[in-house]
Amino acid sequence: MAAPVLRCVRKLLKLVDFTPVPRRYRYKKKWATTEPQFTASRLALQNFDMTYSVQFGDLWPSIRVSLLSEQKYGALVNNFAAWDSVSAKLEQLSAKDFVSEAISHQKLEPESGLSPTPSLDCSPNLRCFTFSRGDVSRFPPARLGSLGLMDYYLMDAASLLPVLALGLQHGDTVLDLCAAPGGKTLALLQTGCCRNLAANDLSTSRTGRLQKVLHSYVPQDIREGNQVRVTSWDGRKWGELEGDTYDRVLVDVPCTTDRHSLHEEENNIFQRSRKKERQMLPMLQVQLLAAGLLATKPGGHVVYSTCSLSHLQNEYVVQGAIELLANQYNIKVQVEDLSHFRKLFMDTFCFFPSCQVGELVIPNLMVNFGPMYFCKLHRLP
């Protein structure tokens, strides 16, 4: 009985490779020093699931799946190019200018017997084309036009709302406090209202991207004249540098960039090494908004914006900055009502109905723009 068993054991031993392993390769893999157990994007989703499920309740599953799905874009027409022919080409794609559609709708309401919408005090001359609800078509990449400038700029169409809300008027002096990568700066220039525009960002690499956008879309005489100034200063100190200077200020602050954080590992604020930076974001945001308000002339307006869903970075920051200016500078600031934006742009965006102050575009599979929070503030004389 023992002999057959021994023969089987010998056969098995012949099949097994007992080649010795060099000592330097014999180690136990340690995840902490090799690949992270959780990627930054996974940590972001984990964080959002914990916080936003409480903040948004039953809406969170819908927002979540939309954030994880492909984003929609709008095409901001370059008014410095042959904008009329560009608009015609975009219309041939069955896209519509959502800004002009909203304004036309507002003008028709009194004739239809509906209650009139408050006057849309928005920045003029902006043309941004989007595909209709549920249409997931994509715009072709922008091309160099006949005038040597790019035809249109692809962006999250919700990013145009803070610029519209700023309500620029001809001859305004304007500050874009956190300007890079440049989409909103370009939109500000498209209005044709800026007598002077200061575009600032602390990061020199990001202002380099901003300069490239301006070079591709804006004529040389405007770029190199006195109309546009690009700087890389600490935005928190702007109230000291140029206090009481600007008619309108856009404060599009650094934030958790929720959609980006779920899709990109590079430069993700949910990296473990950036935990302290992430925790300090609300304080930085309050400081930047306060600086923007101090840089505004008495009677001027500021729009605060983020691409985050977090009320800690949105409503709470607005309230914190208002209290800071009242207590430390004896400056009164009033939040302006933008609820009519929800009515005017409801065909293009999905708005969260329960913001304490300001407006919030939430991602929705039918209209997958955002997130984008924006709030308009009036520095009282």
UniProtKB/Swiss-Prot annotation:
Enzyme class: transferase
Residues noted as binding S-adenosyl-L-methionine in the record, renumbered to the chain: G182, G183, K184, D201, R206, D234, G235, D252
Molecular function terms from GO: mRNA (cytidine-5-)-methyltransferase activity; small ribosomal subunit rRNA binding
Predominant location: mitochondrion
Modified residues (Phosphoserine): S203
Catalytic activity entry: a cytidine in rRNA + S-adenosyl-L-methionine = a 5-methylcytidine in rRNA + S-adenosyl-L-homocysteine + H(+); a cytidine in mRNA + S-adenosyl-L-methionine = a 5-methylcytidine in mRNA + S-adenosyl-L-homocysteine + H(+)
Pfam hit, one: Methyltr_RsmB-F
InterPro entries: MeTrfase_RsmB-F_NOP2_cat, MeTrfase_RsmB-F_NOP2_dom, RCMT, SAM-dependent_MTases_sf
Protein's cellular compartments: Mitochondrion
Example GO BP: positive regulation of mitochondrial translation
Family annotation (SUPFAM superfamilies): S-adenosyl-L-methionine-dependent methyltransferases
Transit peptide, residues from-to: 1-25
EC id: 2.1.1.-
Quaternary structure and interacting proteins, as annotated: Heterodimer with MTERFD2/MTERF4; this interaction seems to be required for NSUN4 recruitment to the mitochondrial large ribosomal subunit.
Functional summary from the UniProt entry: Mitochondrial RNA cytosine C(5)-methyltransferase that methylates cytosine to 5-methylcytosine (m5C) in various RNAs, such as rRNAs, mRNAs and some long non-coding RNAs (lncRNAs). Involved in mitochondrial ribosome small subunit (SSU) maturation by catalyzing methylation of mitochondrial 12S rRNA; the function is independent of MTERFD2/MTERF4 and assembled mitochondrial ribosome large subunit (LSU). Targeted to LSU by MTERFD2/MTERF4 and probably is involved in a final step in ribosome biogenesis to ensure that SSU and LSU are assembled.
UniProt-recorded name of the protein: 5-cytosine rRNA methyltransferase NSUN4
Gene: Nsun4
